[in-house]
């Protein structure tokens, strides 16, 4: 999936993390690819790649997400249980980002690919 964020700060690096979290601008929308079935037991070795206008701009292993994306899922489950809350059927859980935040400031096509899992893309226009 691709996570869409808004840049509502003049200089995001000069803001306290608490203000950014409260604003909610960094968790705005998600673009999904096609649903797939994968029976891998080693999600941390998947490689995520980000392309802008068909040029690869970043790649990294999924182990950047707490050492293994499943660790992020376990953390989420633990937090829900600690708060005595439940995960609802059909709830979507995004586990984190393999790539860094990249600001888009002009029309382009952005594609995210996770090797052996699939891809999704979005076109930004004026």
Identify the role of each PLM range.
Residues 69-105:
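A conserved acidic, glycine/proline-rich C-terminal tail/linker
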């Amino acid at each position: 999936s691709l996570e869409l964020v808004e840049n509502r700060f003049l200089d995001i690096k000069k803001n306290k993390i608490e203000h950014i979290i409260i604003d909610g601008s960094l968790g705005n929308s998600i673009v999904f690819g096609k649903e797939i079935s994968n029976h891998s037991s080693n999600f941390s070795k998947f490689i995520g790649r980000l392309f802008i206008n068909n040029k690869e701009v970043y790649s990294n292993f999924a182990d950047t997400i707490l050492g293994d994306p499943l660790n992020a899922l376990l953390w989420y489950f633990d937090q829900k249980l600690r708060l005595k809350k439940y995960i609802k059927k059909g709830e979507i859980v995004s586990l984190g980002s393999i790539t860094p935040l990249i600001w888009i400031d002009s029309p382009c096509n952005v594609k995210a690919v996770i090797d052996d899992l699939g891809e999704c893309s979005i076109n930004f226009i004026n």
